[in-house]
């Protein structure tokens, strides 16, 4: 760890050592045979202020709102841009799969699947496994809100069914 020079004193990471030009008191003198107190190699002090490790330095950004405007290269046709991107992809050796063919049937299926979360296909055995697993789940008492303690399971199922029916009755907006 490098020593930092502050006001003529040299500070190390663990101790404060007096400068060699200062007079040492009788109890502070260096002892013969003491070597480097650290096993690390000494680091050179950074000569430039603000220079960090590996030579990086802080450079403030211009805060003036009147900056020079950067001129962007004119964009050509959409086809030219797409062709340029495809050329770059081929030059890099990348392959993108062809986009799927669009059809109205797929769009309707996707919208239906998004609006109806219960459309996950499960066989009866899987349904029973999910039911058994969920039956074993219990929330800690502080985790259950007061309104949930005041309503029975039958009442809650009725509320959920009404909410699902209302959701299915409203048209899906695209």
Curated annotation (Swiss-Prot):
InterPro entries: MEA1. Keywords: Developmental protein, Differentiation, Phosphoprotein, Spermatogenesis. It comes from the Eukaryota. GO terms for biological process: cell differentiation; spermatogenesis. Disulfide bonds: none annotated. May play an important role in spermatogenesis and/or testis development. This is Male-enhanced antigen 1. It comes from Sus scrofa. The lineage of its organism: Eukaryota, Metazoa, Chordata, Craniata, Vertebrata.
């Amino acid at each position: 760890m490098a020593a930092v020079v502050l006001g003529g004193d040299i500070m190390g990471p663990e101790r404060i050592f007096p400068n060699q030009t200062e007079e040492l008191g009788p109890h502070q003198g260096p002892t013969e045979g003491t070597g480097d107190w650290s096993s690390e190699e000494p680091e050179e002090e950074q000569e430039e202020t603000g220079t960090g490790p590996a030579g990086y330095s802080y450079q403030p950004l211009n805060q003036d709102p009147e900056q020079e405007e950067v001129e962007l290269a004119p964009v050509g046709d959409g086809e030219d841009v797409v062709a340029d991107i495809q050329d770059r992809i081929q030059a890099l050796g990348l392959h993108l799969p062809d986009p799927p063919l669009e059809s109205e049937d797929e769009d309707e299926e996707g919208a239906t699947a998004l609006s109806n979360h219960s459309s996950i296909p499960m066989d009866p055995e899987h349904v029973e496994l999910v039911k058994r697993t969920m039956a074993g789940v219990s929330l800690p008492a502080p985790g259950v809100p007061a309104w949930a303690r005041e309503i029975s399971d039958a009442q809650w199922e009725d509320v959920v069914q009404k909410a699902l029916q209302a959701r299915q009755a409203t048209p899906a907006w695209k």
